[in-house]
A protein has these predicted regions:
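Periplasmic N-terminal soluble interaction domains immediately after the signal peptide in Gram-negative
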Residues: 113-115
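Pocket-flanking alpha-helical
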Residues: 78-111
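Short, conserved beta-strand segments within well-ordered enzyme catalytic domains
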Residues: 45, 71, 91-94
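Short, solvent-exposed secondary-structure boundary motifs
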Residues: 6, 107-109, 187
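A short glycine-rich beta-strand->turn/loop micro-motif centered on a GG-aromatic cluster
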Residues: 71-77
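Exported/periplasmic ABC-transporter solute-binding proteins
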Residues: 26-66, 73, 85, 118-123, ...
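Sec-dependent bacterial lipoprotein signal peptides
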Residues: 1-24
Length: 313
């Protein structure tokens, strides 16, 4: 064998080795997950209605597991589902519903597995008024008439948007029974904080927010906000004596408060990654205690707090 031929064989062998090394390296990068139950970085989208309580959940989880990083984007429920569908980096959404049959089929076709989803807590859509208002007793019939523009047209109703939000969808489904509200009596703002700010500045206004924005007496910022707004009582239409009920854990868990909705996770993960670890945390005692402290109804059975209400009607 001459030197020229030997050199050609060596070059060919080196080239083959480099190609094999490159292919093997690429395959390992594609196949190997970069996160575990308690480490790594994932991106999630959260319904803005639950921002206060989910910020606390993430803070405590990351403090407990310093190698875990959950990057949350807070947006409308519709935009959360857009992320779930279209953003390959999105691992999970926190919203007010699970997947329907058509969505299950879609994700099975695209992901080749079903996403996991389940209820993790229950929320109350809370009606608030200005602190100077004496109008603190509402029936569902009255809310329906006002949203339809049939009564009290001078009282402005404010939402965190006119469409695409879970609160608007809930009100249309549960109070208006699928009908649309009268947009001339409804004011739209960008988010739940702006709903609270609007009601705090407008004496003749009614707002709708999730209970985690105003229900936590251990949150100094929320206690301060409640100097400017009041949580109203809504009649329990299914109760025999038709009492007016304030949203709190007991009335949420028993459904005596009529405006209760679920809080769900939907997870795109088919291995024991960080999304699964965070869901486990939300479902277990520490996560459920955080929901409880925010005055959501929990899945885990805790003793219900007895609360003395001193606020005048």
């Amino acid at each position: 064998m001459n030197r020229k031929k030997a050199n050609r064989i060596i070059v060919t062998a080196i080239s083959c080795f480099m190609i094999l090394f490159f292919i093997t390296g690429c395959e390992s990068k594609v196949k190997g997950p970069t996160d575990t139950l308690v480490s790594g970085t994932i991106y999630i989208s959260v319904d803005e209605s639950f921002k206060p309580v989910m910020e606390e959940q993430i803070r405590v989880f990351e403090k407990s597991f310093p190698l875990a990083h959950i990057i949350a984007a807070y947006k409308t429920e519709a935009d959360c589902f857009k992320d779930l569908y279209n953003d390959s980096a999105n691992r999970m959404v926190i919203v007010t519903r699970g997947l329907n049959d058509q969505e299950d089929v879609y994700f099975l076709d695209t992901l080749k597995y079903y996403p996991h989803w389940d209820n993790i807590a229950n929320d109350a859509v809370t009606v608030i008024v200005n602190s100077k208002s004496n109008d603190t007793l509402f029936t569902l019939e009255r809310l329906r008439d006002q949203l339809s523009g049939n009564t009290n047209r001078e009282q402005k109703i404010v939402f965190d948007g006119l469409n695409a939000t879970s609160t608007v969808r809930f009100v249309m489904d549960s109070i208006l029974k699928g009908e649309k509200f009268d947009t001339s009596v409804v004011q739209a703002v960008k988010n739940s904080q702006q709903v609270i700010d609007y009601v705090a500045k407008t004496e003749n206004a009614v707002g709708f927010v999730g209970i985690s924005w105003v229900g936590n007496p251990e949150d100094s910022a929320q206690v301060k906000m409640l100097n400017n707004v009041k949580i109203v009582y809504v009649s329990c239409s299914l109760c025999e004596d038709k009492p007016f009920v304030k949203p709190m854990q007991a009335s949420i868990l028993t459904r005596r408060y009529p405006l209760v909705r679920g809080l769900y996770y939907v997870l795109k993960e088919n291995y024991n990654g960080l999304g699964t670890g965070f869901v486990n945390f939300l479902n277990q005692e520490r996560g459920q205690l955080i929901f409880r402290r925010a005055y959501l109804g929990t899945r885990m059975d805790f003793g219900v707090r007895r609360v003395k209400i001193n606020q005048k009607l």
